[in-house]
């Protein structure tokens, strides 16, 4: 039993010793970290014309596991020249992968790199192209060395050599705070900080409420000389206005939102005399991290903003959660009323115009059809037939008793030609009084069957033999003789008009020559005999 108690005492003592050792080790580690923090990466002396800075413990060996950042800023229209002392020693390695010094041309760790240096040979003289140099010293956990000492001075920027020395800049600072606010460059002119012809280097200090951070969102941004950071830029600092706290710098055509980690933000605008048209407008919002309190609104992006910022017409969250579903809460403004009225008027006017266009198209389509139907109804077929139908010849008979048997021959000859086409010529002499050529073609007169029957019914002279039928040539000659010789001797009182098959009177009736058979039989017989000879 006693032996068991002794074992327990031994185990307990060992545990106590272990805990005391761990506590001591933790205390030593905390002390070491505090010492490293208090060392501040060597010394740094600044003055108006330049300065000097060194690695930690220089000229003794620098400590392991150390990283130091040095950012040098010159005045406007000045550049930086950096020199390393000859007493220089940093652990050598291939491409300086271990301990090294890295120099960049600008204020950020992503600025263009100038070079990375290590070994026993000090780097050459380094010149910046602008107002800033970014320098980093890194030491790993093994093989420490003496380190470095560097000095720098400011020189005039050759890009502004023709403009001469910069005039003293006017004091231009602003103080702002609260749950939200707007920072804008127009405040410089409104508050009389500088004239329109002066270069400006203004700063806005924004202070958030306790336990709050700051979110910055650009509402308007334009640089007169884009991509020329020496002439105009907008810079954002997080925590102070020193170059070490520079968060972002904008001098191109785009500016992004910035989320600060502290409750103090600094906005800086630089513009020389030829860049005073540069402008910006920025909204700052104070927020707290979740969990959100009762008087705050959760933005779904690890932001809790004041309830008074919800549905205020401005997007205070990273995403517009605070302005969604706010139409029923917002009062209709005069601009909204005018917009709605204008939209109604435009819509009604557009409908009226469309209706008028449709009516016009319908009228234009139906109007030609109406005219065509009207013209078709006005067409008189009788007039058309009167113009194009050839004339109809009417027969006339003699009331006298001196007719001979020649009428029978004439009737027979006319009956043979009653189916011929009607003549379209208006000249009777071309058909009946023409030359031998017209006689051979024959007349185009169309005697109907009724007309021929009238001729056959006429009485003949008994005792006289009928004249035998004649051929077509002889009949045509006789027709010519009738129209030429007997036309002048035709007595109107002895003529009787015989109705024809024409359904109406032609407009050429006055020009129709009626065939008159007069004279003595001897005269016809003599002409007939003469023709046969």
UniProtKB/Swiss-Prot annotation:
InterPro entries: CUB_dom, LDL_receptor-like_sf, LDLR_class-A_CS, LDrepeatLR_classA_rpt, Sperma_CUB_dom_sf. Residues 366-533 are cytoplasmic. Residues 291-327 form the LDL-receptor class A domain. Disulfide bonds join 41-68, 96-118, 172-202, 229-251, 292-304, 299-317, 311-326. The keyword Glycoprotein applies. Residues 1-22 form the signal peptide. A motif (PDZ-binding) lies at residues 531-533. GO terms for molecular function: ionotropic glutamate receptor binding. Residues 23-344 are extracellular. CDD domains: CUB, LDLa. One of its GO terms (biological process) is regulation of long-term neuronal synaptic plasticity. One of its GO terms (cellular component) is postsynaptic density. Residues 41-155, 172-287 form the CUB domain. It comes from the Eukaryota. Glycans are attached at residues 306, 340. Interacts with PLZ domains of DLG2, DLG3 and DLG4 via its C-terminal TRV domain. Interacts with GRIN2A and GRIN2B via its CUB domains. This is Neuropilin and tolloid-like protein 1. It comes from Homo sapiens.
